[in-house]
Amino acid sequence: MPVTRMTSSYANMKVGRWDISDLVKDPSSEEFSRFLRSIEEQLVQFEGSRQLLRPDISSEEFEGLIHMLESISEKVSITSGHAYLSYYADTSSNEASALVIKMEKLASEISNRMLFFDLWFKKQIDHENANRLINAIPKAYQEHLRHKRLVAKYSLSEPEEKIISTLEVTGIRALTKIYDKMTSGFEFTMKLRHGRKTIEKKFDNKEKLVSLVRSPDGNRREAAYKSLLQVYKRNSGVLGEIYQNIIMQWRDEAILMRGYRSPISVRNIANNLDDATVEALLAACRNNVSIFHDYFIEKSKMLGMKKLHRYHLYAPISNKASDSKKFTYGKAVETVLDSFGDFDPQFRGHAERVFAKHHIDSEIRKAKRGGAFCYSVTPKLTPYVLLNFDGISRDVSTLAHEFGHAIHSMLASDMPLMVFHAPLPLAETASVFAEMLLNEKMAEKMSKKERRILLAEQIDNLYATIIRQAYFTLFEINAHKAIGENNATIDAVSRIYMDNLKEQFGTSIIISPDFEWEWVYIPHFYHTPFYTYAYSFGNLLVLSLYKQYKLEGRSSFVPKYFKILSAGGSRKPEELLMEAGIDISRQEFWQQGFDYVQEMIQQLKALAP
């Protein structure tokens, strides 16, 4: 795709809503109905090709079926994308919610009707003819098709797969939708003490509240956490039961029906990673957690505290409000784009295209989905980015992070839809790298004191994206075992989570009892079990890549880096990274990332007054 370069200044840009009319202009229009009918027509044609599925099918016929399947899938992605983005923009909208249900049912029906092709290739064609077809098809598809054959042993019969696909709409998907609807409607009351008075402040968007856990004011940090955790604890009965049911359904399907080795193996195989690789990653995180214990002890000294409390984990190292810089949205955008441009003009140009297409929703408002994400619908369409921008420095980092995801998608836009998305372990390769570019740019004009503040923020972020995420996965392993095998109660799961926190922080931090309910606040546990280790993987990988970039320089590094990003999901992660000189099967590789973190902590200590 061509790179867009906007010439106007971004300094005066304001937060706003996205324009999703590139997907569907009006879901109630005749035009949209015609679009849905065109999907049905193609689907009937595809179903009629079933007679071609013989062992001796020609490679041309096979490739034609692949392209037909992709054409249908692309149209479904567009209709589903519009429904989801409408819903995320306003989760209280009954129309948007109804459209999501309609599109999910349609997608499930279409998936069921195309299932015969997938199952035929996985289980019914012999090994020799499968390899013949794989070797004859364009290279971009080959690893994906090999992986399909690899996971074939976990596939069930066509009728069984259809039943599972149909039940998902009213099963796990319905449960996560209830979780989203319930939690997005939460209202929070933060209580702040001023002398003998208690002042209450209401929040109807948890992102606004959560941003205060990084406030320079310790009372605000503590009050924000207490308000957040109190609401989730009050609703833990329902939220906990939703989680229990998700785990039982995950276990029933993955272990009892499909025969996976363990609950996490489902995610590992989907990521095209060996269990042993993930185990090595998690072991490295546990072995190096003391690095962050050292940091938390140092941070408590910088904050003038005897010992750091969990409420103050993300406290800025300066408690002066004047040191907590606020950014206008325009300045944040300008800074991020400049950092991208310093690295590579193409990197910046791709990010600018998101603004040119108005594919960003950045304002905070009631009923909008919290957090931030990048949604890539198809290779041909510019990705969509959702933010909840409140002007703190972390929001600027989030902006860079999500635009990194968008750039990753755009660099992979030459890949077919089937292999367009990077696998989870590589999904953070551009987003975290983009954050590091931003940090370097921001440090250029900083004083020693400001660099110290930025460095502490970076280490805080590395804790949050490496150790915290790895320990989330370790918690999930234990929670799935406890619920799946022993029918653990919600209180028992909370105790498992508290034990996890105690190992994670050791004696470096004081943990109050209310944090045992933090787990019901983590949406990844509900939406995508065992997802979070990919953040640990991605961040440690990027630390290695960034080190390589600084050693080699742009001219040598950029082509290799872009090759990784442009591959999308067309290559096995181990093989793709090996070409760049990175062997993720070696324990020493993961240690390099932690050594880099340790260097940063030493730099922080050296900057102390």
Residue ranges and their predicted role:
Residues 259, 390-410, 431, 436, ...:
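Active-site recognition of the HExxH zinc-binding catalytic motif
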Residues 324-329, 380-400:
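Short pre-active-site segment immediately N-terminal to the catalytic Zn-binding motif
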Residues 2-321, 607-609:
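A well-structured
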Residues 298, 302-345, 385, 408, ...:
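Long, K/E/R/D-enriched contiguous segments that form extended
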Residues 12-14, 21, 27, 122, ...:
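C-terminal, non-catalytic "cap/extension" segments appended to globular domains
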Residues 418-430, 461, 490, 528-535:
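Active-site metal-coordination segments of metallo-dependent hydrolases
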Residues 338, 342-349, 375, 405, ...:
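Conserved helix-loop functional segments at active or binding sites
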Residues 322-327, 361-382:
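Catalytic zinc-binding patch centered on the HExxH motif and its immediate surroundings
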